[in-house]
Amino acid sequence: MNVVKRPLDISQLPDAGEVIVDAEGHVAGRLATYIAKALLERPNLRIVVVNAEKLVITGDEKMVIEWFKRKISEWRTHYNPEKAGPKVPRRPDRVFKRIVRGMLPKKSETGRSALKRLRVYMSIPIEIMQRKRLVLYEVPEAKLRLRPLLQYTTLEEVWRSIDPEAWEKWRRAVEVWGKKLKQVASG
């Protein structure tokens, strides 16, 4: 398998087909705006985002985690503990898809069809890894630029602190997936 990483420019996107974006090291909001714009401008283009757990959210780690915890728990009250308010995603792939959804006009047919053409995965699925030539695109404008005293956290770290049991299950599944990937690569 041949893996190639290339920078991606919105003006050079194909009109149809599939584009695979590697989200590692990208700032979540910046990448989401780029993807939302591309989905709206190109109605026949499918975008696949891989490594969603490595997306970055800037800000103090404790502040970001507390914000997520408050967002998840604010709808349950003492008077009505079973209240089912808005469902807030916890997994990194679903969090990122929700961020992109917030940037699309979800009440119009254009926005709904654009969201259907977006796929977000944690790590890289085996179906994608089995391709003979894999081109992973990166968005240079959305990459995290490291500066002194810059505080950031990844979506995986946020997920680990919010839902440690689910994170641990996923971590074990990644180990099994790694073994399968080695088998695919060798045979």
Swiss-Prot record:
CDD domains xrefs: Ribosomal_L13 (cd00392)
GO aspect biological process, one term: translation
GO cellular component, one term: ribosome
UniProt xrefs under InterPro entries: Ribosomal_uL13, Ribosomal_uL13_bac-type, Ribosomal_uL13_CS, Ribosomal_uL13_euk/arc, Ribosomal_uL13_sf
GO MF terms held by the record: mRNA binding; structural constituent of ribosome
PROSITE patterns, per the entry: RIBOSOMAL_L13 (PS00783)
Keyword annotations of the record: Ribonucleoprotein, Ribosomal protein
Function: This protein is one of the early assembly proteins of the 50S ribosomal subunit, although it is not seen to bind rRNA by itself. It is important during the early stages of 50S assembly.
Family as reported in the entry's similarity comment: Belongs to the universal ribosomal protein uL13 family.
Quaternary structure, from the entry: Part of the 50S ribosomal subunit.
Record protein name field: Large ribosomal subunit protein uL13
Gene: rpl13
